[in-house]
From Swiss-Prot:
Interacts with RELT, RELL2, OXSR1 and PLSCR1. Induces activation of MAPK14/p38 cascade, when overexpressed. Induces apoptosis, when overexpressed. Belongs to the RELT family. Residues 36-52 have a biased composition (Low complexity). Residues 79-271 are cytoplasmic. Residues 24-57 are extracellular. The modification Phosphoserine is found at S109, S114, S244, S247. This is RELT-like protein 1. The keyword Magnesium does not apply. PANTHER family: RELT-LIKE PROTEIN 1 (PTHR31037:SF1), RELT-LIKE PROTEIN 1-RELATED (PTHR31037). The chain crosses the membrane at residues 58-78. Residues 155-165 have a biased composition (Pro residues). The gene is RELL1.
Length: 271
């Protein structure tokens, strides 16, 4: 109920004002008027996954000095071993020139129209042992087996009658001794089918035997890992002492006396 001194409309207005003040946002009371206070909201950054977003350039900058230091460390180790009488070598150094010559000749003989059989034969012919075995098999088949196919280049083969020639072509002999013929038969012209289409590679006569690097006198292999090898060469003074001992022992054995060791000589000199 409303108080007695106040009218009902005044009480209703006061109630509406109080309810609006409670439900409205914060306002600043000022003589100029009421202005709403700005609300401050704080946003927390969401955690992002930085595992995949790294910096690979920093890793490269760190790896390059590491490899550089490792190379210098290896050179230092080889230098120290060389001072102590060891020798660090690789087996691939001796065959560098031979491999270059073989690659040049193979590149010259390779043709774009080479078939699969020619490539297989080329890979087989790279091994000298296969070449020798194949040559021996061809000789055995030509000499021992009377039913083996006879090629025009085989010694003792009957003359082959040339086939029909086109006008303007002079007949000639079949001269292709630079490769092996697997199938014998009449030849139409002065070249065979493979020579005409250039489907056969030249066979390189390999008579030389691969000889390893000649070892020095007194050279002993200490460590061998793959192609890396560490050898030790004895000083020349020890070799001269051994030679002198061998010469002395040889003269003593000729005279019929037992060779005396250096220890016994020192004992006899002290007595």
């Amino acid at each position: 109920m409303a108080p007695r001194g106040l009218p009902g409309s005044a009480v209703l207005a006061a109630a509406v004002f109080v309810g609006g003040a409670v439900s409205s946002p914060l306002v600043r009371s000022d003589h100029s008027g009421s202005h709403p206070l700005p609300s401050k909201t704080e946003t927390t950054p969401s955690p992002t996954n930085n595992n995949g977003n790294g910096h690979p350039e920093y890793i490269a900058y760190a790896l390059v000095p590491v490899f550089f230091v490792m190379g210098l460390f290896g050179v230092l180790i080889c230098h120290l071993l060389k001072k102590k009488g060891y020798r660090c070598t690789t087996e691939a150094e001796q065959d560098v020139e031979g491999e270059k010559v073989e690659k040049i000749e193979l590149n010259d003989s390779v043709n774009e129209n080479s078939d699969t059989v020619g490539q297989i034969v080329q890979y087989i012919m790279k091994n000298e042992a296969n070449v020798d075995i194949l040559a021996a098999m061809v000789e055995d088949n030509n000499v021992c087996d009377p039913e083996s196919p006879v090629t025009p280049s085989t010694p003792g083969s009957p003359p082959v009658s040339p086939g029909p020639l086109s006008p303007g072509v002079t007949p000639g002999k079949h001269i292709c001794g630079h490769h092996l013929h697997t199938v014998g038969g009449p030849v139409e012209r002065d070249v065979c089918h493979r020579c005409r289409h250039k489907r056969w590679h030249f066979i390189k006569p390999t008579n030389k035997s691969k000889e390893g690097r000649p070892r020095r006198q007194g050279e002993v292999t200490v460590l061998s890992v793959g192609r890396f090898r560490v050898t030790k060469v004895e000083p020349k003074s020890n070799q001269k002492e051994r030679r002198s001992l061998m010469s002395v022992s040889g003269t003593d054995s000729v005279n019929g006396e037992v060779p005396v060791t250096p220890v016994k000589r020192q004992q006899s000199d002290s007595e």
